[in-house]
Regions:
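Extreme N-terminal starter segment of soluble prokaryotic enzymes
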Residues: 1-4
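Active-site-proximal betaalpha loop/short-helix elements
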Residues: 19, 28, 135-137, 226-302
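Short, compositionally biased
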Residues: 214-229
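Helix N-cap motif at beta-to-alpha junctions
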Residues: 310-315
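Charged/polar low-complexity intrinsically disordered segments
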Residues: 53, 58, 66-70, 76-77
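Acidic, Ser/Thr/Pro-rich beta/coil linker or hinge segments at domain junctions
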Residues: 324-367
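Short Gly/Ser/Thr- and Asp/Glu-enriched loop/turn motifs at secondary-structure junctions
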Residues: 34-35, 300-305
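Glycine-rich phosphate/pyrophosphate-binding loop regions near the starts of catalytic domains
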Residues: 13-52, 75-204, 210, 222
């Protein structure tokens, strides 16, 4: 690798190569888990004792607790039990165009993206950091609309923006606006990809490919009715956990789509995964966009659709819950015993082919 190409941001093999190169420098057990959000605890495996607290206070390590105690808007649960496990996820958003339709823009996306990542490891999101990089010349009207979208989605998700930053760069040095958010949530029940094993059922929470297709429509000024699926997934995830469905792993199918998620799971678990083509719902509008531009819907990004592995005995309960939110949720496959790290796509006639991990320049700046 001599220089960075657009393909290095596409969610496929080139991106995995880049991540390995960069983050191997910071190698630790938490990073190695490769979940959507890092699962951490403060003060090690237990509560800080009095001497530890004194030492930590001198080193500034208790600033989080102290700041929360001084903030009268925080609930009591937010300032206790720093030895609990938490999930943290950060993401930067460079969506182009910054407005996809009347409902979805970079503001809504930046909240849903980070909040959903925290939800995917079984955490309840509580706090959000918010940082803007704004290009000189962005209209205040656009900025206000984006800010209102952020506020609306934070209220829906039940998260507070607790810190932030704003930078302005000269005209021509950016593309209207970039946003970074970091979500912070308390673990309800940890769901980690390292626990994927033979016999688990694979489900998807809805139809696939709509966000990527919506971006293509806007960039090419096409007449099409396809809308992004961008949404916060808190209701779906919390319903599954509240009903004690045995969810083993979850992943939102963003860059690289369904294909990227399944291939990552196959690689991490060392197991084959089979999925059934007729069980995966793809809307006709998305199929049309894929045919026009030569994409596979399995590789198109989603921003409000997630994939999950559950115990076989719980698959119908999981499906019933998910279909309350999206009738297109479905059971799409299972984890096999073969240790070859492949994703196998089987059609209605029994013919099979490998669903490869995405490669090359897919669709840059979709989130």
């Amino acid at each position: 690798m001599k220089e960075i190409q657009l393909a290095h941001g596409g969610g496929g093999e080139e991106m995995n190569e880049l991540l390995q190169r960069l983050f191997s420098l910071f190698d630790n057990g938490i990073l190695k888990e490769a979940n959507d959000a890092a699962i951490v605890s403060f003060g090690g495996s237990g509560n800080l004792n009095s001497s530890d607290k004194a030492s930590s206070a001198q080193n500034g390590n208790l600033n989080l607790s102290q700041n929360l105690e001084q903030n009268s808007t925080c609930t009591q649960k937010s300032i206790l039990n720093l030895s609990d496990k938490f999930a943290i996820s950060t993401d930067s958003f460079t969506l182009s165009p910054i407005f996809l339709d009347d409902e979805v823009n970079i503001g809504k996306l930046c909240v849903c993206g980070s909040v959903n990542d925290v939800l995917m490891v079984g955490a309840d999101p509580e706090f959000l950091s918010l940082a803007f990089i704004i290009e000189e010349g962005l209209s205040v009207e656009k900025l206000d609309k984006i800010a209102q979208s952020i506020k609306k989605e934070c209220d829906k998700a039940g998260v507070q923006v607790v810190c932030g930053d704003t930078k302005v760069v000269p005209k021509g040095k950016g593309d209207e606006i970039y946003i970074n958010t970091t979500a912070f949530g308390r673990i309800i029940r940890a769901c980690e990809t390292k626990n994927i094993r033979q016999g688990l059922s694979v489900l998807v929470s809805g139809d696939i490919g709509r966000h990527g297709a919506a971006v293509l429509v806007q960039r090419n000024a096409l007449e099409a009715s396809v809308k992004s699926d961008c949404k916060c997934l808190k209701d779906e995830v919390m319903s599954l956990l509240r009903e004690n469905v045995e969810v083993v792993a979850m992943r939102d199918a963003t860059r690289g789509g369904l294909s990227a998620v399944l291939n990552e799971w196959a690689r991490q678990s060392g197991l084959d995964i089979v999925i059934f083509e007729e069980k995966i719902i793809i809307k006709d509008e998305v199929k049309g966009i894929c045919e026009l531009f030569g994409y596979e819907a399995y590789e198109l990004a989603n921003e409000g659709t997630f994939v999950l592995c559950v115990e076989k005995a719980h698959e119908q309960r999981a499906l019933q819950i998910l279909q309350k939110f999206n009738k297109n949720a479905s059971i799409i496959g299972e984890v096999l015993k073969n240790r070859k790290s492949r994703v196998i796509l089987q059609n209605a006639y029994g013919a099979k082919r490998f669903l490869e991990a995405p490669k090359g320049e897919l669709l840059p700046r979709i989130c």
